[in-house]
Swiss-Prot record:
InterPro entries: Vma21 (IPR019013). It is a multi-pass membrane protein. GO terms for cellular component: endoplasmic reticulum membrane; endoplasmic reticulum-Golgi intermediate compartment membrane; ER to Golgi transport vesicle membrane. Residues 1-21, 76-93 are cytoplasmic. A motif (Prevents secretion from ER) lies at residues 90-93. It comes from Cryptococcus neoformans var. neoformans serotype D (strain JEC21 / ATCC MYA-565) (Filobasidiella neoformans). It comes from the Eukaryota. This is Vacuolar ATPase assembly integral membrane protein VMA21.
Length: 93
């Protein structure tokens, strides 16, 4: 006894389509998470902290956290906009 459909294939859940804007934002923030903390580390190591690796690492951690907060803010704004839907247009005579 298995959960097979009469065609012999396993039943699948309906697939939701991924919106291009969501995928674009995910790729953008993934690239930012890869580039910005490393760039922040090396730039602050040489120009701001004069070779102090501890403070440069703290700066990189702060940069990564700012990117994460930015992603969460963008996600919440997008979710709130999708819940309310488009505003109805007012007709002027």
């Amino acid at each position: 006894m298995s959960n097979r459909v009469s065609t012999g294939k396993m039943a699948m859940a309906p697939q939701e389509s991924v919106q291009p804007a969501v995928l674009y934002k995910l790729v953008l923030f993934a690239l930012l998470m890869a580039v910005v903390p490393i760039g922040t580390y090396f730039s602050t190591l040489n120009y701001l902290w004069d070779g102090s690796t501890t403070f440069a690492a703290i700066s990189a951690i702060a940069a990564a956290n700012l990117i994460l907060v930015g992603y969460v803010v963008v996600a919440f704004r997008e979710d709130a906009a999708s819940r309310t839907g488009p505003l109805p247009e007012k007709k002027t005579s």
